[in-house]
Amino acid sequence: ADFPSAEYPGLIPQAGPKSRYRLIHWWYWLFERLWSLRGMENALMDFYLYPGQIHQLFDKLTDFYCRVLERGKSERAADGLFISDDIGTQKGPFFSLDIFREFFKPYYKRLIDKAHALDMHVWMHTCGNIELFLPDLIEIGLDVIHPIQKYTMDEAEIAKKFGGQITFWVGFDVQQIIPYGTPQEVAQEVRHLVDTFARKDGRF
């Protein structure tokens, strides 16, 4: 089968009004796309069994996403791209730092560099404990990270170590407080997140 074309009409989702910051979105960056095609067990083994093919896939995907950025800028006057890649579990990352640096970091950096060249930001959603990868994500210029998942990392420690180096778009506790909490507990959670992550320059 042919690789999907980034020139399809209507490929770029609608954005908000031009008077506001305009964010386009695209799910399934690299790892999510890999395991959606190969299954989780195969995907995790592929880094060791078929490294060349993984690089080939990630390179093609990055070409595709870079074109999405170009179209988002020209067709939607987008200010940023919100993209997802769940690379963490509740307990830790899916793979080692060495795997991340070989297979993910170069392609993440290429997309982020492309966005910055277009005067755009990259917002990344990634569930799970990804503290191990945060210094590298900051190094390659990621602008916004979401959500610093509850119960996977020490929120206060993350804010202390990395605050001022990257913008945190922090997420609510969607496993306990949102589905089961009282209105008071929801309000307390909001207060906790603001107190933990708020910065003087107005960004989380």
PLM regions: where:
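Active-site loop segments of alpha/beta catalytic cores
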Residues: D2-F204
